[in-house]
A protein has these predicted regions:
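Non-catalytic accessory/interaction domains
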Residues: 1-90, 98
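Self-processing/autoproteolytic domain segments and adjacent N-terminal interaction modules in large
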Residues: 64-172
Length: 173
């Protein structure tokens, strides 16, 4: 396969105080970059300003108080329990592609064939929130077709899975 392309992609690095955005050029199936920074980043985001057309809907919120926070376009609502020592930045990404498969066999648990979420950001010490992630197994024309192929039988055994990042196995929360 000959891939001839040159796609600029922004990477934003943050230490919770300062953000630095750099543009890299993706020009092959695999690339490696060395990016010198004048800070120690605690968080990074790829294509934060959504300039690349992909299968992700993302939204960020700066949390400044305990409240119910609707994260628009992501089908997630946060119920902030504790603000922590200062405001936190929360980024929700709703990926409209299947998640990576289990690394090890996990009988009886099936991953969505359609979507998953990732949650990251700059979380200050003491920050605590609960999240409501919308599951919709209906075929309603307005809000449905999100999970209609996921569970075709009883929906009484739905579990929420988590992994700290790629290369880790999914685990039940």
């Amino acid at each position: 396969n000959n891939h001839i392309y040159s796609m600029p992609v922004e990477i934003t690095f943050s230490d919770g105080i300062q953000d630095t955005t750099v543009t890299i050029i993706i020009d092959s199936l695999t690339n490696s970059y060395h990016i010198p920074l004048l800070m120690l980043p605690t968080w990074m985001a790829l294509d934060r300003n959504e300039k690349v057309s992909d299968a992700i809907v993302a939204n960020e919120r700066i949390i400044t108080s305990t409240a119910v926070v609707i994260v628009n376009e992501t089908n997630v609502t946060l119920y902030v329990q504790n603000l922590g020592v200062s405001p936190s930045l929360v980024r929700i990404e709703h990926h409209f592609v299947p998640p990576d498969p289990f690394l090890q066999s996990n009988p009886g648990i099936r991953l969505s064939d359609y979507h998953y979420w990732s949650v990251n950001g700059n979380f200050t010490n003491g920050f605590l929130t609960k999240g409501l992630f919308v599951y919709d197994g209906s075929t309603n024309g307005t809000t449905g077709y999100l999970d209609n192929t996921f569970i075709t039988g009883s929906e009484d055994s739905l579990v929420f899975l988590y992994r700290p990042g790629a290369g880790f196995n999914w685990q039940v929360l």
